């Protein structure tokens, strides 16, 4: 029997034992899973039968208050009403519905997944910045603890697995840094962990893998994110060892990222002036966002201690790192235009219009919508879709142009449906080319600045941008947000999230 038929039987009053609890599970589950009611759970909707809605809500709460305890009435209302979406084409009898029992059909393909907490550390400049001596596993532990602190209803013992992205998983961020960070964060030893790598999209990939595992029924609660210290582990790692066959037959697979940006600029007519203007705007938006406190909700401070010389008695100092240190208030078009090209003598890419090398970490708690409901946690966002695409390594910066349509197709959306896009600014040249070739409205891109100003801690960035995009959706009362980036080696990635506030 199909889920919609089982739901109909429930509504028509076929009864067995354990009525109210199972019925509540069916209402929520079918709202989340049945294609006919695919619209997202928790999203407010207008429903004509307000009296019936209130009656049914009160019946269910009366029978099983523990399952709805702590939820405000609006939240209860939205969850339950979603299950009675009238598109199924029949009238619900609340009295019968509250006393029936059905078995959820196995045809229900996937569950909805929500993000209930998403935070990041402030981003430090690599090599000379505040975090230069802070280990990436420590940064990740701070992010994980910060994410858990936002949802005190969740017992860490419920976490099934931790997935962290890291672009250069060696040295201080080797030895399965996800496991090291989870133990450092104080998670129970029973909580497993894994480190994954898709270069610049590793953090976003981690969130997608956690979400899809929950969708498939393999877990209820996961932690996902990313960490990277470019101060400690340089781009390319400590020992670069190219594959000899590729060096002979496809050397462009190892082309430096800066030169790939130059090829994209040359192909699509991206000028030096446009790159510098884009860079300046990134700094201006980031500085304005910091001044307005827009990043306060998504960031967790990093406590630090260090010892400074003080005569015969070294002095120990403790500080708290709270604010991104990449944005420059002193930058200008004149200053940017005076910089030399960094990768090609006649190129357009400079140190000023490229992403900063950075240190940072981010963590997101991902869980099934059913579990969030049971725990009384109001989700921040719904995971909608994720897609990757391969492209020519020598023009890797164009990767998002090919990943974005795939993510939109999976979500059943159009590009015009996306209200906010966090496009990683690996280089101004490639970001401008992506905006141009993908047909993106520039006004929807990086409203609070991007990696040119705020930094790009490689494996952390996708998770960091996820924390940012869902807060911006909340501020704007907008619905859909996207995180997208190019990926070294010739790829693109894109993830779509829906605001539930």
PLM-predicted stretches and their roles:
Residues 10, 19, 28-31, 50, ...:
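Short hydrophobic alpha-helical segments enriched in small aliphatic residues
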Residues 120-122, 133, 137-142, 153, ...:
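N-terminal extracellular/periplasmic Venus flytrap/periplasmic-binding protein-like
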Residues 166-220, 251-262, 330-356, 437-464, ...:
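Conserved catalytic cysteine-centered active-site region
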Residues 100, 104-180, 185, 263-272, ...:
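Conserved active-site "lid/cap" helical segment
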Residues 196-227, 265-295, 363-370, 435, ...:
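Active-site-proximal alpha-helical scaffold in enzymes
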Residues 131-244, 254, 299-322, 394-395, ...:
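Conserved beta-ketoacyl condensing-enzyme motif
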Residues 104-136, 331-398, 402, 409, ...:
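Condensing-enzyme catalytic core mediating Claisen C-C bond formation in acyl metabolism
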């Amino acid at each position: 029997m199909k889920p919609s038929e089982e739901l109909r039987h429930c509504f028509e009053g076929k009864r067995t034992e354990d009525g109210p609890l199972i019925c509540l599970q069916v209402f929520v589950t079918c709202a989340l899973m049945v294609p006919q009611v695919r619209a997202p759970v928790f999203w407010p909707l207008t429903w004509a039968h307000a009296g019936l809605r209130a009656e049914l809500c009160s019946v269910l709460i009366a029978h099983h208050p523990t399952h709805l305890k702590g939820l405000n009435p609006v939240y209860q209302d939205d969850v339950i009403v979603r299950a009675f979406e009238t598109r199924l084409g029949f009238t619900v009898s609340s009295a019968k519905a509250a006393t029936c029992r059905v078995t959820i059909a196995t045809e229900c393909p996937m569950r909805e997944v929500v993000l209930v907490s998403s935070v990041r550390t402030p981003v430090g400049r690599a090599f000379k910045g505040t975090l230069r001596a802070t280990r990436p596993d420590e940064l990740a532990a701070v992010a994980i603890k910060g994410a858990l602190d936002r949802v005190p209803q969740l017992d860490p013992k419920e976490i099934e697995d931790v997935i962290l992205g890291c672009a250069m998983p060696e040295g201080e961020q080797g030895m399965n840094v996800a496991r090291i960070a989870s133990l450092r964060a104080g998670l129970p030893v029973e909580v497993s962990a894994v480190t994954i790598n898709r270069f610049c999209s590793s953090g976003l990939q981690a969130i997608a893998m956690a979400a899809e595992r929950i969708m498939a029924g393999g877990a209820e609660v996961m932690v996902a994110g990313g960490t990277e210290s470019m101060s400690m582990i340089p781009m390319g790692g400590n020992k670069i060892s190219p594959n000899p066959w590729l060096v002979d037959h496809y050397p462009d697979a190892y082309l430096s990222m800066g030169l790939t940006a130059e090829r994209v600029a040359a192909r699509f007519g991206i000028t030096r002036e446009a790159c510098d203007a884009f860079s300046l705007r990134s700094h201006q938006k980031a500085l304005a966002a910091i001044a307005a406190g827009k990043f306060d909700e998504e960031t967790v401070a990093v406590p630090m201690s260090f010892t400074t010389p003080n005569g015969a008695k070294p002095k120990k100092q403790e500080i708290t790192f709270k604010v991104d240190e990449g944005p420059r208030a002193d930058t200008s078009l004149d200053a940017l235009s005076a910089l030399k090209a960094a990768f090609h003598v006649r190129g357009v890419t400079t140190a000023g219009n490229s992403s900063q090398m950075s240190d940072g970490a981010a963590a997101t708690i991902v869980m099934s919508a059913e579990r969030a409901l049971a725990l009384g946690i109001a989700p921040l966002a719904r995971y909608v879709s994720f897609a990757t695409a391969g492209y020519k390594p020598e023009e890797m910066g164009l990767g998002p142009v090919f990943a974005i349509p795939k993510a939109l197709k999976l979500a059943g959306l159009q590009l015009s449906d996306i209200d906010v896009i966090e496009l990683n600014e690996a280089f101004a040249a490639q970001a401008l080319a992506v905006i141009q070739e993908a047909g993106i409205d520039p006004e929807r891109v990086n409203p609070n600045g991007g990696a040119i100003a705020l930094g790009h801690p490689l494996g952390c960035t996708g998770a960091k941008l996820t924390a940012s995009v869902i807060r911006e959706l909340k501020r704007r009362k907008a619905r859909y947000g996207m995180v997208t980036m190019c990926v070294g080696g010739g790829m693109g990635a894109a993830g779509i999230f829906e605001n539930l506030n």
